[in-house]
Amino acid sequence: MTFDKFIIWLMAIGILLGAGDRLLKNRFGLGQKFEEGLNAMGPLALSMVGIVSLSPVISNILGPIIIPFYKFLGADPAMFASILANDMGGYQLALSLGENKEIALFSGLIVASMLGCTIVFSIPVALGLIEEKDKEFFAKGLLIGLSTIPLGSIVGGLVMKINIKILLINIIPIILISLMLILGLKFFQGKMIKGVLYFGKFIMWMSTIGLAAAAFESLTGVVLIKGMAPITEGMSVVVNIGIVLLGTFPILTLIINLLDKPLRKLGKNIGLDSTSVAGIIFSLANSIPVFKMLKDMNNKGKIINVAWLVAATSTLGAHLGFTAGVESEMIIPVILSKLFAGVSAVIIALIFTRNTTEKKSI
């Protein structure tokens, strides 16, 4: 049995465990996670289906601009799609723009799960949840996390067995975008953050308009936006992901419980408080609780947590579920790339925070 199939079987067992615990009135906390997996389909549909339906339209509009530019760089146009999160249209747009399916999968599933997720999800969501006094630490962690995305991407590409020369050429746009974000956050933090927030709102508008237009066309047959994919295409992807998430969340709960003690011991050895260690564990499932917990971490923990979650967020949660739902053979490359980039970011953050005071900011 391959590792990909092992993961799928593990998720399937998680479904049975979650369903069984639900019948036992959530005695072990797995029944609730089973329900959360199904409930995740609503938010997923809101963020995904509109962009999926609009992907052919976006491809037709941007193609004449993006394709020549990326060809000039020697890269596949699919790499452009990595500025969107994998589960927020990045995967579908990569397939629409891509000339090489292997590179499209690399961009839409690996790079988009780190770079795109940071741009359209992590930054906008975090800035709405963290306190003003923590924005300095958030920015520092963000800079470190962004710097390791190209490293994680290379690892993922090598695991996919992409030719090293082709891989390095296609990494160039990612390095350029990461560098622009790093320099922008370093020297024009306010303007850069405002720009990212506007971009996030633009994506939300696009997904809402796309969803409404596709739903209207499905019910009436009247085409509002020419060239859109049918709404059923996006909905079928959401359903596939939802099935996987039914088992992902219960299994993830068990994994987090297993990792809790060893990670807390490790955290104590490197100067992290218990909240910081919990944040690292929770972000493997979802980063939203971590942003809410940031105020209770010591300064070192804040920087390390943000650096880690830039790439590692949802590695064993929604991103695993999404990958398993659309391209199960990509599970290993996605997991390894995100973890490698995340661990690399933590190592760099530990070096940079050696002299950081452990006292919580006031």
What are these regions (language model features)?
Residues 54-61, 94-101, 158-159, 219-224:
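Transmembrane alpha-helix boundary signature
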Residues 32, 36-76, 83, 99-102, ...:
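Helix-loop-helix hairpins and the membrane-proximal interhelical loops
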Residues 42-59, 86-92, 149-152, 286, ...:
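A generic, lipid-embedded transmembrane alpha helix
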Residues 73-148, 273-327:
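Alpha-helical membrane segments and immediately flanking helix-loop junctions
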Residues 14, 64, 91-92, 121, ...:
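A generic alpha-helix surface/boundary motif
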Residues 248, 262-268, 275-280, 285:
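Intrinsically disordered, low-complexity segments enriched in Gly and acidic/Ser/Thr residues
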Residues 1-50, 107-115, 120-247, 321-362:
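Signature of multi-pass transmembrane helix bundles
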